[in-house]
């Protein structure tokens, strides 16, 4: 039921805010609304009950364990939210003079420096407004670098078959041809295939380390040498940065550019369509091409860099410098943790993943890469279970909802059949992990003894099996009031 379904003509709530607008007589007649907007007419109690009910139907970090692999669904401390919302930070207009925003700009400069430190990069720009936006900026800088050298023949980006789907999409948007290389039996990049793929046409390699398979690329030193010797650059997808936060730095591995998903690693909000933040870090060779604005420190005076400071910049990613409220949350989180706290994030995230992986192995679940240690997430494959019972990974995931757990990522990465990609993050307790293992064991037993029970799940939610194809093909995102 939508809020509009509660609407009744003339029903109103007391205004919570003062009226604004005043006299509109100075507006041209063609810009003035002639009809009342199609807004619901409801009481305050209707609104409170409606949205409270909706919140109770949602799965969220506040209420359930959320082991959504490669999404790092950690708990975001409330302090980060409350401190970042202080009006002293957010009241500044983005077009106001730098002199009037020294506190905010100083905070943003410190965040840039902390991100540089934790990633080992030479420079950071926080202009991109989402992870994919930062990814686009990173590949655009690779292109600008090669174009500046007159190396127009480099029009190929290499992408492993375990990469995030945004990687080939971004490369294509930036005008590159994508060349896919396989993963070997241990989940690592196939070095022989990489050597065969590089050449004078290679602009770069896009890599996630640890990978989406949950394993660390132990041959990263050799990988970066192969790519750099061929004249290409190395791109780091920061999706799994939480696993190595400050312990191992992409810059030290030889990466030339990285985008960071602050919603995964630095305690900013997930989902909802935004706002977001996707800062990019670069090695020395890409410093001239960073997107603007970024914050400069001129002998204690903080200011936003412009085209005059970076004439080779790829330009502006948005009207202003990212989303201020999101960046402030990341700043508070980084200050609360400090360098040692960030190290503990990586340690506990890895510990939780390996504990959960070991417990599920003991319970009889098959691991996609049983000889490898989990970095932050791992893959369970249910292929044997499906062959024996007909219960698929999707069925298993739906049944988990009945036990109060959000399902892990299903059917991704694509190269592992009937897979569950599980990432517990550092903020979950051992008791929570043990409860999840118990639910997994119970569902496995149900699949083996009463498979139809699992195939019919979920039973406890207001909606059950949705038509995903219809939802994707027949978009209906707007409310249309009845005539």
Swiss-Prot record:
Cofactor requirement: pyridoxal 5'-phosphate
Membrane-spanning segments: none
Entry keywords, A to Z: Oxidoreductase, Pyridoxal phosphate
Any single biological process term in GO: glycine decarboxylation via glycine cleavage system
Primary role: The glycine cleavage system catalyzes the degradation of glycine. The P protein binds the alpha-amino group of glycine through its pyridoxal phosphate cofactor; CO(2) is released and the remaining methylamine moiety is then transferred to the lipoamide cofactor of the H protein.
Any one GO cellular component localisation term in the record: glycine cleavage complex
UniProt signal peptide: none
Listed Pfam families: Aminotran_5, GcvP2_C
Quaternary state and interactors: The glycine cleavage system is composed of four proteins: P, T, L and H. In this organism, the P 'protein' is a heterodimer of two subunits.
EC number: 1.4.4.2
Native organism: Thiobacillus denitrificans (strain ATCC 25259 / T1)
Entry keyword DNA damage: no
N6-(pyridoxal phosphate)lysine, modified sites: 264
Region: Disordered, residue numbers: 1-24
Gene name in the database record: gcvPB
Entry protein name: Probable glycine dehydrogenase (decarboxylating) subunit 2
Enzyme class: oxidoreductase
Entry's family note: Belongs to the GcvP family. C-terminal subunit subfamily.
């Amino acid at each position: 039921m939508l809020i509009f379904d509660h609407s009744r003509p003339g029903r109103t709530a007391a205004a919570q805010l003062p009226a604004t607008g005043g006299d509109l007589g100075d507006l041209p007649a063609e810009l003035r609304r002639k009809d009342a907007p199609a807004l619901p007419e409801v009481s305050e109690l209707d609104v409170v009950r409606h949205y409270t009910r909706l919140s109770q139907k949602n799965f969220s970090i506040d209420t359930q364990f959320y082991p959504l692999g490669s999404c790092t669904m950690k708990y975001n401390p409330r302090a980060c939210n409350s401190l970042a919302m202080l009006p002293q930070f957010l009241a500044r207009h983005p077009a106001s003079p730098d002199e009037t925003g020294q506190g905010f700009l100083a905070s943003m400069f410190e965040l840039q420096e902390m991100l540089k430190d934790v990633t080992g990069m030479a420079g950071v720009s926080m202009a991109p407004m989402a992870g994919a936006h930062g990814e686009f900026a990173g590949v655009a800088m690779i292109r600008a670098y090669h174009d500046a050298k007159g190396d127009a023949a480099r029009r190929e980006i290499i992408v492993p078959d375990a990469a995030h789907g945004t990687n080939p999409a971004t490369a294509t948007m930036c005008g590159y041809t994508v060349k896919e290389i396989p993963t070997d039996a241990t989940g690592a990049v196939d070095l022989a295939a990489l050597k065969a793929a590089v050449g004078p046409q290679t602009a770069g390699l896009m890599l996630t380390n640890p990978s989406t398979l949950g394993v660390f690329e132990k041959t990263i030193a050799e990988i970066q040498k192969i790519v750099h010797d061929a004249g290409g650059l190395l791109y780091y997808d920061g999706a799994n940065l939480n696993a190595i936060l400050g312990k191992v730095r992409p810059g030290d591995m030889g990466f030339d550019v990285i985008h960071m998903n602050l919603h995964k690693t630095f305690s900013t909000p997930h989902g909802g369509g935004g706002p977001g933040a996707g800062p990019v870090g670069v090695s020395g060779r890409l410093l001239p091409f960073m997107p603007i604005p970024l914050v400069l420190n001129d002998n204690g005076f903080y200011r936003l860099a412009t085209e005059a400071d970076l004439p080779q910049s790829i330009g502006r990613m948005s009207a202003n410098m990212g989303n201020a409220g999101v960046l402030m949350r990341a700043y508070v989180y980084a200050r609360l943790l400090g360098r040692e706290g960030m190290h503990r994030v990586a340690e506990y995230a890895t510990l939780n993943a390996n504990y959960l992986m070991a417990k599920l192995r003991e319970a009889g679940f098959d691991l996609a890469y049983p000889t490898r240690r989990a970095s932050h997430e791992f893959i369970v494959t249910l292929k044997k279970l499906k062959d024996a019972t007909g219960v698929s990974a999707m069925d298993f995931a739906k049944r988990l909802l009945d036990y109060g757990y959000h399902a892990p990522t299903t059917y991704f990465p694509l190269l592992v059949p009937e897979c569950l990609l599980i990432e517990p993050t550092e903020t979950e307790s051992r008791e929570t992990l043990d409860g999840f293992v118990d639910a997994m064991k119970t569902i496995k037993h149900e699949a083996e003894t009463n498979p139809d029970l699992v195939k019919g799940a979920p039973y406890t939610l207001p909606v059950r099996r949705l038509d995903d194809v219809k939802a994707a093909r027949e978009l209906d995102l707007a409310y249309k009031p009845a005539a």
